[in-house]
Amino acid sequence: MKYIIVTGGVMSGLGKGITAASIGRILKNRGYRVTAVKIDPYLNIDAGTMNPAQHGEVFVLGDGSEVDLDLGNYERFLDIELSGPHNITTGKVYRSVIEKERRGDYLGDTVQIIPHITDEIKCRIEQAATEGDENGAAEICLVEVGGTVGDIESMPFLEAVRQMRGELPEDEMVLIHVTLIPEDTMGDMKTKPTQHSVKALREAGLYADMIVGRSEHPIGLHTKRKIASFCDVAAQAVVSATTVPDIYQVPVELEKEGLADAITTHLHLDRREALEEWYNVVAREYTSRITVAIVSKYGIEDVYLSIKEALKHAGRALATEVKIVWLDAERYEPCQLADVDGILIPGGFGIRGIEGKIRAIQYAREHNIPFLGLCLGFQLAVVEFARHVLGWKDACSEEIGDGRHVIAILPEQEGVDDLGGTMRLGNYPVTVKAGTIAEQLYRRSTITERHRHRYEVNPEEISALEEAGLVFSGLNGPRMEICELPGHPFFFATQFHPEFRSRPTRPAPAFLGFVSACRKNKKTP
């Protein structure tokens, strides 16, 4: 197993996760089997209970793990399926060590950060790295150490990496440090922040083999040589990673900088020619443009990162640029929906913004605007239909109020008090009905999709909803998973989250259908 450790310095938010995913992609382009591990140095067990406004999207893996959004980037860039062990948190590590101490596994030892915590970290990295899938075990494992070098929270993880480096042969680990190269008012690139960041890395007992400099403009040879001189790396090991308009362009830029060659040389991997698949995806040109309104609770785009990317995947496959208009569910005006080509209601929880989302669904249904609802968007589509087609004015979800509960809590969720990891999570099979839009999109009778919810369509109300014209075209046993409206340009909603399985090379069918319908019903120039 070869390890690529990715650390970050100077500041957070540099795009370290995208850089790590892109490194994995350029190696996969050369035919290597690559997996990835994200280390999050927070005390939470996982991302499931974290405020998305602070932390961004909670990404759900196939095994039901609720993880950091960077794992979504890994899955999209590498086109792989990861599992919970690939997200290591301080909370998981400490809980495991404390449980072992309580069982007596340490035989009376004084339990300390070194060696017990660091041993647990190393064990978890190695277990995740060697976990295989249908394609076999990986050859290369990317390990992104979250946070910034110098943070107190990251120190045990950096120490574990230091120990691993000493235990492994030199050609089995490479450390890539991602740092910021700012410019002064005269446009000159400043290397001092990078020098200090590398110094902090050395203080942790680690040294960088390669440096990726994040900058607004390409890093010139003079600056690269200066960084190389002060940071003890070769000039060709200093790589420029400029800001690009499309994140899927980053692997192409890193390949041009020679990073793949530098990594394979350091790790003594055989040289292989890069495959063209990724470059063909990136190079596709747009022939049309649509505008999609996302009516949401949060005004932070990272909360809906996978939806943004899934729209981009579908748009690229259909040569259509997708412009997103973000509308606050509590404040938007109906006139703002008049000129969009499609309306999307994402998942979410709680009562805030619910009525605004329902009004947007009603507008889409009555004005024949393509509509896609996801998770909560699916549930609210049922509520809207019950209110305005069946005339049940008090129709609502059990989650949000009293009235006629067309959306009810799942039986297994009754009496559940703990919030973390207790929802209906991960992959479940969905049976697709013949002769429906769902069948046209998926072209299969059974599909597998990822879930994250506690509520479902009330079984007692299904017959009345179907008799009024709502079609439930996807089922999981007694549970309704997909609904659609015949005769509408595109009115489609899913209880599951199709965005979590969308890939640049394999867009999610629900998003393909939505973007295609938006193109056909295009209003915007």
Swiss-Prot record:
CTPSs have evolved a hybrid strategy for distinguishing between UTP and CTP. The overlapping regions of the product feedback inhibitory and substrate sites recognize a common feature in both compounds, the triphosphate moiety. To differentiate isosteric substrate and product pyrimidine rings, an additional pocket far from the expected kinase/ligase catalytic site, specifically recognizes the cytosine and ribose portions of the product inhibitor. L-glutamine binds at residues 348, 376-379, 399, 454. GO terms for molecular function: ATP binding; CTP synthase activity; glutaminase activity; identical protein binding; metal ion binding. Belongs to the CTP synthase family. It catalyses: UTP + L-glutamine + ATP + H2O = CTP + L-glutamate + ADP + phosphate + 2 H(+); L-glutamine + H2O = L-glutamate + NH4(+); UTP + NH4(+) + ATP = CTP + ADP + phosphate + 2 H(+). This is CTP synthase. Keywords: ATP-binding, Glutamine amidotransferase, Ligase, Magnesium, Metal-binding, Nucleotide-binding, Pyrimidine biosynthesis. Allosterically activated by GTP, when glutamine is the substrate; GTP has no effect on the reaction when ammonia is the substrate. The allosteric effector GTP functions by stabilizing the protein conformation that binds the tetrahedral intermediate(s) formed during glutamine hydrolysis. Inhibited by the product CTP, via allosteric rather than competitive inhibition. ATP binds at residues 13-18, 70. Residues 1-269 are annotated as: Amidoligase domain. HAMAP family: PyrG (MF_01227). GO terms for biological process: 'de novo' CTP biosynthetic process; pyrimidine nucleobase biosynthetic process. The active site is at residues 375, 497, 499. Residues 292-524 form the Glutamine amidotransferase type-1 domain. Pfam families: CTP_synth_N (PF06418), GATase (PF00117). Its EC number is 6.3.4.2. Mg(2+) binds at residues 70, 144. Catalyzes the ATP-dependent amination of UTP to CTP with either L-glutamine or ammonia as the source of nitrogen. Regulates intracellular CTP levels through interactions with the four ribonucleotide triphosphates. It comes from the Archaea. CTP binds at residues 12, 151-153, 190-195, 226. It comes from Methanosphaerula palustris (strain ATCC BAA-1556 / DSM 19958 / E1-9c).
